[in-house]
Amino acid sequence: MSVDPACPQSLPCFEASDCKESSPMPVICGPEENYPSLQMSSAEMPHTETVSPLPSSMDLLIQDSPDSSTSPKGKQPTSAEKSVAKKEDKVPVKKQKTRTVFSSTQLCVLNDRFQRQKYLSLQQMQELSNILNLSYKQVKTWFQNQRMKSKRWQKNNWPKNSNGVTQKASAPTYPSLYSSYHQGCLVNPTGNLPMWSNQTWNNSTWSNQTQNIQSWSNHSWNTQTWCTQSWNNQAWNSPFYNCGEESLQSCMQFQPNSPASDLEAALEAAGEGLNVIQQTTRYFSTPQTMDLFLNYSMNMQPEDV
């Protein structure tokens, strides 16, 4: 079916007739002889639009957008799912650390060196690693782990032992000497410092004690106290030997003007008394006297008793 060339001019007229309420513009139509062709073309246009309408931009947007009834917000991933997906992506990236297995000989050497020296220099670590056929990093890591273990052990066990020591070391009988000791017995969690504090064992306390010792020695251990009259020779002389001398001195004092015969008689009396005393002491000091007393006691009869 042929369409006249006036059809393009008649199309705006048809559109204008449909929306004449919105636009009251005057409509200009072609001649009357072209009117039937215009009606045919206008009748065919809706048919072609219904059969194959051209897709517009709005139609494309509607087709791409999801239907709210079928999938309401279900296709959009949440933040939790995103984080889980990221973690799953990162898990295979992590590398598991290979744990070094030391032999018994290596452990013995390392422990011995750690007991003597806890911190090694770079050169010492390199020498030790060469001796043990280990890498520098392995030796360094082992020493770091061992230091942490020792500190943890001291932190867990040191307070218990220190409390027991302080309780057992109490000495109430000597408060003047041990009062500073209890104050200086402190707990050391790190284990690097000595147990005794500098305040308790400083030079001032020791100097005071030495001064006290000197004063004690000067007052009590001097020679004057020991060299008394009780330790002289007169105290050790027996009264038996002094009897004659005393009698002689008494005779000399009370008879200054006596004649010579009286003096000789006094000397003889003093000498005889001295000899008698010496003989009696010698007689009683011999073992024969002891035997006599024993025999006499054994031979005594009940009648005599």
UniProtKB/Swiss-Prot annotation:
Which Gene Ontology terms describe the biological processes this protein takes part in?
cell differentiation; endodermal cell fate specification; positive regulation of stem cell proliferation; positive regulation of transcription by RNA polymerase II; regulation of cell differentiation; regulation of DNA-templated transcription; regulation of gene expression; regulation of transcription by RNA polymerase II
- Extract the ranges annotated as region (Sufficient for transactivation activity): 196-240
Task: Spell out the residue ranges making up region: Disordered.
Answer: 1-96
Altering residue 144 to A: what's the impact? No effect on POU5F1 promoter DNA-binding. Decreased protein stability
Q: Where in the cell is it found?
A: Nucleus
Ranges of biased composition (kind: Basic and acidic residues): 83-92
Under the GO molecular function aspect, what terms does this record hold? DNA binding; DNA-binding transcription factor activity; DNA-binding transcription factor activity, RNA polymerase II-specific; DNA-binding transcription repressor activity, RNA polymerase II-specific; RNA polymerase II cis-regulatory region sequence-specific DNA binding; RNA polymerase II transcription regulatory region sequence-specific DNA binding; sequence-specific double-stranded DNA binding; transcription cis-regulatory region binding
Q: What is the effect of changing residue 151 to A?
A: Decreased POU5F1 promoter DNA-binding and protein stability
Q: Effect of altering residue 136 to A? A: Decreased POU5F1 promoter DNA-binding and protein stability
Note the segments forming the sequence repeats.
Answer: 196-200, 201-205, 206-210, 216-220, 221-225, 226-230, 231-235, 236-240
Which positions does the record tag as DNA-binding?
95-154
Q: Which stretches of sequence are listed as region Sufficient for strong transactivation activity? A: 241-305
Extent of Polar residues compositional bias: 65-81
Which GO CC terms are listed, alphabetically? chromatin; intracellular membrane-bounded organelle; nucleolus; nucleoplasm; nucleus
Per the record, the domain of life is Eukaryota
Query: Region Required for DNA-binding: what ranges?
Result: 122-151
Q: Which UniProt keywords apply?
A: Activator, Developmental protein, DNA-binding, Homeobox, Nucleus, Repeat, Repressor, Transcription, Transcription regulation
Tissue spec. comment: Expressed in testicular carcinoma and derived germ cell tumors (at protein level). Expressed in fetal gonads, ovary and testis. Also expressed in ovary teratocarcinoma cell line and testicular embryonic carcinoma. Not expressed in many somatic organs and oocytes.
What this chain does, per the entry, is described as: Transcription regulator involved in inner cell mass and embryonic stem (ES) cells proliferation and self-renewal. Imposes pluripotency on ES cells and prevents their differentiation towards extraembryonic endoderm and trophectoderm lineages. Blocks bone morphogenetic protein-induced mesoderm differentiation of ES cells by physically interacting with SMAD1 and interfering with the recruitment of coactivators to the active SMAD transcriptional complexes. Acts as a transcriptional activator or repressor.
- Subunit structure as annotated in this protein's UniProt entry: Interacts with SMAD1. Interacts with SALL4. Interacts with ZNF281/ZFP281. Interacts with PCGF1. Interacts with ESRRB; reciprocally modulates their transcriptional activities. Interacts with NSD2.
Family designation: Belongs to the Nanog homeobox family.
Query: Anything else the record notes?
Result: Exists an other tandem duplicated non-processed pseudogene (NANOGP1) and 10 other NANOG-related nucleotide sequences located on different chromosomes, all of which are processed pseudogenes lacking introns (NANOGP2 to NANOGP11); except NANOGP8 which is a retrogene.
- The protein's name in its UniProt record: Homeobox protein NANOG
Organism listed in the record: Homo sapiens
